[in-house]
């Protein structure tokens, strides 16, 4: 890996860290507003707990999709369903934000991660 590639990967990680500050409309059991990474962590944990009940799934792919599915929210936050309007295209906005975040990465990795997000958004995988 050359220095430019390494810098791009580190830049991506730094930019996606903004996700830690994104709050969702959901709340924890204690009543505190949940962050997007907390939501993602719980989703990954649920996937692990139910993995044995879904033996036909590609578990590695499932976990990757869990991690990537809300990454675009790092730039403009979460838009809860109750705040969406007919004019607002949450999917397109999040995809564009994800593309912006991925820009620092090598092209093959960009394509791979965007394909995972598209898989999630279009419900391609079982």
Question: Which residue stretches match the model-derived regions?
Answer:
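Alpha-helical, largely C-terminal catalytic domains
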Residues: 1-126
């Amino acid at each position: 890996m050359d220095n430019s590639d390494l810098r791009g990967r580190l830049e991506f990680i730094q930019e996606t860290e903004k996700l830690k500050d994104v709050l969702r409309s959901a709340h924890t059991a204690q009543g505190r507003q949940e962050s997007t990474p907390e939501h993602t962590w719980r989703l990954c944990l649920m996937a692990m707990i139910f993995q044995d009940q879904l033996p036909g799934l590609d578990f590695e792919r499932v976990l990757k999709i869990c991690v990537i599915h809300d990454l675009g929210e790092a730039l403009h936050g979460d838009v809860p369903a109750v705040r969406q309007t007919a004019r607002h295209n949450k999917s397109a906005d999040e995809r564009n934000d994800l593309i912006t975040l991925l820009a620092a990465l090598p092209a093959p990795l960009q394509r791979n991660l965007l394909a995972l997000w598209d898989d999630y958004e279009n419900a391609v995988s079982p």
